[in-house]
């Protein structure tokens, strides 16, 4: 136990170091030059809008959170309720601080880019690293410190149901914040983007981020609340939920074993080691002699990945060792095999990054095919974009299948869980790449609105083009890890269910229930699969509808301002930017509530609905389990299709900004008919990649978390 205590303290120290590094980076970013007075005024407007939105969003979520906290206390225990509170608060804090920094880094990045491309890259990436390392550090601290409190201060055994229920509740707290942040932020950002583009670019013929567009500040606010705060909450949740699910599986599989304590500390130690490798990896991001921005970012990612192999070895040595740990379902589990599973997780991450970049990167076949289709019109652009979005699901799915089968062969379901933990271990670096995107996007907007030299806009555009790809890449990573993480949660559900059923004398609700069969000949299983499969589609449809409504409101507002203030187009009158921001804030908060509750309530409806119809608890649990699989499988394909397809549409549009040469050798420039067709495609792709697709992510996991909590609640019933 002494060694276990030392490892736990070391894990907590790694989390603290990550937060300290983020604080140092914040001081460094805020010390940079803010540029001209005009630049600072624009940045202040973006900052005010983002803060107003996030404050209102979290105030709304807090009401839901208080109700859930009281329910968790009443139905489970105070410890479980506190776990929920820790997960929710830390998830919110991560997003808030990340956005707080990004809305201050944007103007500083624009100023740095006016001096050199390398300076702009360094500042934008450093601000992204702050969000990334806060996500990893606070998620690791949340789980490890609460586990320390439960097992050391309160004296519970590591596999005690109180510990497991409390940690699962922590994951639920993070999930609830995540789904609201992802969906609300996505509705805001894409409502502004779609509305601003349709009237500004297509109708008025003015460029992106033109200060004459009344929606331009709202668009820049949206980049921060969607891509920074939203992604931070999403990956915080995936990180926390995956670590918790792996610990729960460890507690189930190794219950009563001497290796139990070390097995439960193993995923925490992997994440602790990988936090350190992510910190070291940030120092490798430097612009090389070839001037490749993506190359500079990939240097950091590759360094983190290679160092993480060493980190995995350290985690093995300090916890489970290299020999045999125990036997699970007749399969011998060794430390060496678990180490290889961790390596497979890192390889899966690398492959998903490469595949996503191929489908969304400029000058790659998929993006060029959409740009080429734009030459023949709006309809062909949309058709080809949909074709690319569907095609983009195949390779990631094959990689994920390979990861599942290979890790299962090596170490069973616990091996798969360790692979996902290793994937999430490097989340600090991955989120840094993502949060880099909104900062560079905002920097370009500020440069345009402040009327800086065209060379500055050229530098920020180069950073922004890479930022678009990194945002797409990180979404691919987030979806892949979410799909695998949800599979681990499903394994926890099925094994938890088997545990309760086998111990009916302790848990009366499960006594005399009979065996639960997930056999496909069971009609309740098929019904559950179909019901679960519809959730990502219905959820995605609701999200797209919400963006359409918000975007429509922005279109009306921008048209109204152009109509009532004709001086806007000549520069004699100033647009009312705050009106569009306020309108979108209200719309996003209003539109996010019902879709967000769908994946939370669905498992409860499935269980009690089937129980009412069949009168059989076993049939109800089988239908619920099958519905979780339906959500995971369809959710994975819907999310990958939407995010990769949307990213490809976006970069196809960007191809025209520097001039796109078609198959016949004709060059099409910005403002051409082909460019207008590409803007239409991007208008469809925007809510695909930034609202519906990413929000399916937390929806997949929250259904599984709710199912786990439902088991815990039923187990507490007399």
Swiss-Prot record:
It is found in: Cell inner membrane. Keywords: Calcium, Cell inner membrane, Cell membrane, Hydrogen ion transport, Ion transport, Magnesium, Membrane, Metal-binding, Translocase, Transmembrane, Transmembrane helix, Transport. Its EC number is 7.1.3.1. Homodimer. Substrate binds at residues 190, 689. The gene is hppA. Mg(2+) 2 binds at residues 220, 223, 441. One of its GO terms (molecular function) is magnesium ion binding. It catalyses: diphosphate + H2O + H(+)(in) = 2 phosphate + 2 H(+)(out). The record marks 471 as: Determinant of potassium independence. It is a multi-pass membrane protein. Proton pump that utilizes the energy of pyrophosphate hydrolysis as the driving force for proton movement across the membrane. Generates a proton motive force. GO terms for cellular component: plasma membrane. InterPro entries: PPase-energised_H-pump. It is an enzyme of class 7 (translocase). It comes from Brucella suis biovar 1 (strain 1330). Its main location: membrane. The keyword Metal-binding applies. This is K(+)-insensitive pyrophosphate-energized proton pump. Mg(2+) 1 binds at residues 193, 197. Belongs to the H(+)-translocating pyrophosphatase (TC 3.A.10) family. K(+)-insensitive subfamily.
């Amino acid at each position: 136990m002494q060694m276990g205590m030392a490892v736990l303290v070391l894990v907590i120290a790694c989390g603290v170091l990550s937060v300290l590094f983020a604080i140092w980076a914040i001081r460094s970013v805020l010390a940079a030059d803010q540029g001209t007075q005009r630049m600072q005024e624009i940045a202040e407007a973006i900052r005010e809008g983002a803060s107003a939105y996030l404050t209102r969003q979290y105030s709304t979520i807090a009401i839901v959170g208080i109700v859930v906290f009281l329910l968790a206390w009443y139905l489970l225990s105070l410890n479980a309720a506190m776990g929920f509170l820790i997960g929710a608060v830390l998830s919110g804090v991560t997003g808030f601080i990340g956005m707080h920094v990004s809305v201050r880094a944007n103007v500083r990045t624009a100023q740095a880019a006016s001096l050199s491309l390398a300076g702009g890259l360094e500042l934008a990436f450093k601000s992204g690293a702050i969000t990334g390392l806060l996500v990893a550090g606070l998620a690791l601290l949340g789980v490890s410190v609460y586990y320390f409190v439960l097992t050391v201060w309160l004296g519970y055994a590591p596999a005690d149901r109180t510990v497991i229920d409390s940690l699962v509740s922590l994951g639920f707290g993070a999930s609830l914040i995540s789904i609201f942040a992802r969906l609300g932020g996505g509705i805001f950002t894409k409502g502004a983007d779609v509305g601003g583009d349709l009237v500004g670019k297509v109708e008025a013929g003015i460029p992106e981020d033109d200060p004459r567009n009344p929606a331009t500040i709202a668009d820049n606010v949206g980049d921060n609340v969607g891509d920074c705060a939203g992604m931070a909450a999403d990956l915080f949740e995936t990180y926390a939920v995956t670590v918790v699910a792996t610990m729960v599986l460890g507690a189930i599989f190794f219950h009563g074993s001497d290796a139990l304590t070390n097995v439960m500390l193993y995923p925490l130690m992997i994440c602790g080691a990988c936090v350190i490798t992510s910190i070291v990896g940030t120092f490798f991001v430097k612009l090389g002699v070839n001037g490749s921005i993506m190359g500079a970012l990939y240097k950091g990612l590759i360094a983190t990945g290679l160092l993480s192999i060493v980190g995995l070895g350290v985690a093995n040595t300090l916890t489970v060792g290299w020999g045999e740990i125990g036997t699970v379902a007749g399969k011998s589990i060794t430390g060496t095999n678990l180490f290889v599973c961790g390596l497979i997780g890192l390889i899966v991450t690398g492959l998903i990054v490469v595949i996503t970049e191929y489908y969304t990167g400029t000058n790659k076949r998929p993006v060029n095919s959409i740009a080429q289709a734009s030459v023949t019109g709006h309809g062909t652009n949309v058709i080809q974009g949909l074709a690319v979005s569907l095609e983009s699901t195949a390779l990631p799915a094959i990689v994920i299948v390979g990861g599942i089968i290979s890790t299962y062969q090596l170490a069973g379901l616990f091996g798969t869980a360790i692979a996902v933990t290793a994937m999430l271990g490097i989340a600090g670096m991955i989120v840094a790449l993502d949060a880099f995107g909104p900062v560079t996007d905002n920097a370009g907007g500020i440069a345009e609105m402040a009327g800086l030299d065209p060379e500055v806009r050229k530098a920020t555009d180069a950073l922004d083009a890479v930022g678009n790809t990194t945002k797409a890449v990180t979404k691919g990573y987030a979806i892949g890890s979410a799909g695998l993480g949800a599979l681990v949660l499903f394994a926890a559900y099925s094994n938890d269910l088997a545990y309760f059923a086998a111990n009916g004398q302790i848990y009366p609700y499960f006594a005399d229930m009979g065996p639960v069969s997930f056999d496909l000949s069971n009609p309740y299983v098929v019904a559950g699969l179909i019901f679960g499969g519809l959730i990502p589609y219905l959820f995605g449809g609701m999200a797209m509808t919400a963006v359409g409504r918000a975007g429509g409101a922005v279109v009306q507002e921008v048209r109204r301002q152009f109509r009532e203030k004709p001086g806007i187009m000549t520069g004699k009158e100033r647009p009312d930017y705050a009106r569009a921001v306020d309108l979108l804030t209200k719309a996003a908060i209003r539109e996010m509530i019902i879709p967000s509750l769908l994946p939370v309530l669905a498992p409860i409806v499935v269980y009690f609905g089937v129980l009412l119809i069949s009168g059989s608890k076993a049939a109800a649990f089988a239908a619920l389990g099958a519905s979780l699989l339906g959500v995971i499988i369809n959710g994975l394909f819907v999310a990958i299709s939407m995010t990769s397809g949307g990213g490809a549409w976006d970069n196809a549009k960007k191809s025209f900004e520097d001039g796109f040469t078609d198959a016949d050798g004709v060059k099409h420039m910005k403002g051409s008919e082909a460019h207008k067709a590409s803007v239409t495609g991007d208008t469809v792709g925007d809510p695909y990649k930034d609202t519906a697709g990413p929000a399916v992510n937390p929806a997949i996991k929250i259904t599984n978390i709710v199912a786990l909590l439902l088991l815990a609640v039923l187990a507490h019933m007399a």
